[in-house]
Each structure stands twice: as C-alpha cells, then as structure tokens.
A protein has these predicted regions:
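Alpha-helical transmembrane-bundle signature of multi-pass membrane transport and export proteins
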Residues: 1-267
Length: 267
C-alpha cells in the first residue's frame, strides 16, 4: 500500500471508491429487504432486485461511451451527487411507506422504490466506468497494474463483504438507517473526488453517443474472444441474480433468518 501513502490523488480515488462501494453493498441488502417489508409478493420483490441490475444490462456500453466523451471527474462527482439525492429519497420511502403496505398501495410503493433503484444502478454504472478509466491519469504507468488491483479489491471488499452485513445490523436497528448511511457515504465520496487533481485530456471530437454505441457493438461482435467473454459473464450474472432476487424471501420464510443473519449469509 506504499502507493496509497505517497500519491495523494490515488489515495483520494481509492478512499472515494471504498466509501462509494460501501454504499452499493449496503443497498444490495437494504433495497430487497425494504421491498419484503412493504409486500410479500415475490414478483414485486423481484422487481426491485431486477431494477437494481437493469441499468448494467442496458447502459454499460453507453456509459463507457459517455466516459470517453466527457470529463471523468465531473461524471464521478455528478453520479455520487445523484446517488446521494436518490438514497435520501429512499430514506423518505422507508419513513413514510406503511410496512406492510395495503394491497393497493404496495404496487405503487414498489414502483417508486424500483424507480429509485434503477436510477441508483444507472449512476453506479457511470461512476464505476469513470473511476476505472480515470486511474491512468492518477498513477504512473509503472504503478497502473498494482493500483488497478488494489482498486478492484477494495471495491469487492466494501461492496460484497462489508456492505451487506453492515446493512443487516443497521436495518435491525432502524429500517431507514442503511439509506441514511448511503446518503452520507455518497456525500463523502463526492467531496473526495472533488479534490482529486486530474490532468486535462486532449480535446475529444464529440460525436453522437448512439453512433459510438453502434460502433462499439460492431467492434465487440468482430472480436470473438471478447464477445464470448461478455456473453459468458452475462449468463453468470443473470443466473446469480435469479438466486439473489428471491433469496430475501427464502431467508425469511424457509431459513427463518433475521435481517442480521441474512446480511451474513450474503457474504
């Protein structure tokens, strides 16, 4: 971790990614659990889980194009500000939506939560793309491989190993608590990214985003290994989501787990 202590800009980027991905990990448990408190309908609960990942499916390539065309620091700051606002909206939802909600109101409530979840996923796609591509501007070429490994590792640790169990403990204390933590984490990440000094990039010729997306799709199709890798990872993620989508009900109704225990199950 020598690089962390000697490179201020990398330290800020690393810390911002850690805090930001902690918020993502907290949301991964908190959103489906909130849905299960609102309704016991598996389809409605699955809608919330589906919405959180839908943005990755439909917006990954457009987000990459946008990252190439626009200032990456501004994209990261904007994405974290948007996520801060959206999670504040989830705090309001957790405080105001009846738990459980009446049958007629549950559908509307789930649609609201799903909409916020989708927008959170959309901001996450843009933010994570920008964070990965800005790294070469923050560290020397000789440190790039090590820095990329460290950045990926902290994202996985915070998002997959710390975030979900922490969310479980917070929900056990108060349902809005994980979303309050999310709001604060994204606010902190915004401040860290704001102070990163990133050299200006050469001017980019702006073209239609959709034209760039089509060109990227053609490029992927013409590179067989990349196409096969993308399809394989897509299928793996889809199968994983089939489990995660309904796992919250399985934990509650079959295993009889508390929210704290469910958080530990997700590690």
């Amino acid at each position: 971790m020598t690089l962390f202590f000697t490179n201020k800009n990398y330290r800020l980027l690393f810390s911002a990614s850690a805090v930001s991905n902690l918020g993502d990990g907290v949301s991964a448990l908190a959103l489906p659990w909130l849905a299960s408190l609102i309704t016991r309908d598996p389809m409605l609960i699955a809608t919330v889980a589906f919405a959180t990942r839908l943005a990755w499916f439909i917006c990954s390539i457009p987000a990459g194009v946008i990252t190439d065309l626009y200032d990456r620091k501004h994209l990261m700051v904007g994405a974290d500000i948007l996520r801060m606002i959206l999670t504040a909206g989830l705090v309001v939802c957790a405080l105001t939506i009846p738990q459980p909600a009446p049958a007629g109101a549950a559908f509307t409530a789930i649609l609201i939560v799903s909409g916020l979840a989708f927008l959170l996923g959309l901001a996450e796609v843009v933010r994570d793309n920008a964070a990965q591509t800005v790294l070469p501007s923050v560290v020397a070429k000789s440190d790039l491989e090590r820095a990329n490994g460290q950045l990926w590792s902290i994202e996985q640790i915070m998002g997959a190993f710390i975030g979900p169990p922490l969310a479980g403990f917070l929900i056990a204390w108060a349902v809005p608590a994980p979303f309050v933590l999310d709001t604060l984490s994204f606010a902190l990440a915004t401040g860290m990214v704001f102070f990163i000094a990133i050299p200006s990039r050469p001017a980019v010729i702006r073209r239609s985003v959709w034209r760039e997306v089509v060109e990227d799709m053609v490029w992927i199709r013409s590179h067989r290994v990349i196409l096969q890798l993308a399809l394989m990872l897509g299928v793996m993620n889809a199968l994983g989501m089939l489990v995660v989508t309904i796992l919250v009900l399985y934990s509650q109704e079959v295993l009889g787990l508390s929210v704290t225990q469910h958080g530990l199950l997700l590690i």
